[in-house]
């Protein structure tokens, strides 16, 4: 591995990606130094000649040769630099080893949720701004509607109140989602804040993590609850562990919207109805919301968005599909 050539090519790749907004792949040859673990005895399956050849390609030694060949450093300079680094690492290791250990469950769990709060408090949208955004719908806001419509209204308000929110997912843009929950959002707020994603749940949650790292509060949609399980490790292994592993220094907030649970009559298929909630209850620090009616859904959606913005919380918001378009909630013609 030629580190100088790698640096040059990486800078070129970065410039290309920024200019043309295209992905860039770096194709390089690497070597495998030493075994995978202490029990991996390389001499059991590789000859001494093979091991020696690999060691001669050690990037550290190769880089040292480049520096000497180009008269950047002498061998004694490189040895001194190596020894200084070794001593510094040893000193830091000794210091880290002497630090107090975590002694109880409270200490261990203290950073599952970050204690850092966002002090910026977005103002509630003014009525004149709401009237402009909602247009003809403004005069209908006080009427009773099913859950899907009420959530749509709530998302309009959230996008107005929190300028750092973005909404994305499969067909959530111009189409407005399968159940029109995101209808007119792209028209009213533009394609930079409301946009379609690839048909890939891993990418959707990966995008969300990246947005969260950069000061946004993403509100992604996973089209059906069963689809989440294709990408659950993005949340379990990456997103939800960030605060814990960084000692509360970093967060990547998000509000993941997922329709699921009991389905509309006549629609089947395990890829839509495999509704396991156990995965969410097994992830420390995650907020799981599941409203039973449209009015509660609006209040809860506002509340969890505030938690995500202020405290960097990770939220999974499950909507009952069977209630999305229901008007008579408890009894026939009750219009609740």
Task: Give the residues covered by each predicted segment.
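Ubiquitous "structural anchor" signal
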Residues: 43, 79, 104, 185, ...
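Glycine-rich ThDP/TPP pyrophosphate-binding loop and its adjacent helix/strand module
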Residues: 1-98, 281-336
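Conserved phosphate/pyrophosphate-binding and hydrolysis machinery centered on Walker-type P-loop NTPases
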Residues: 82, 102, 175
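Outer-membrane beta-barrel domain signature, strongest for Gram-negative TonB-dependent receptors
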Residues: 76, 95, 99-111, 118-119
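Thiamine diphosphate
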Residues: 109-314, 322-324
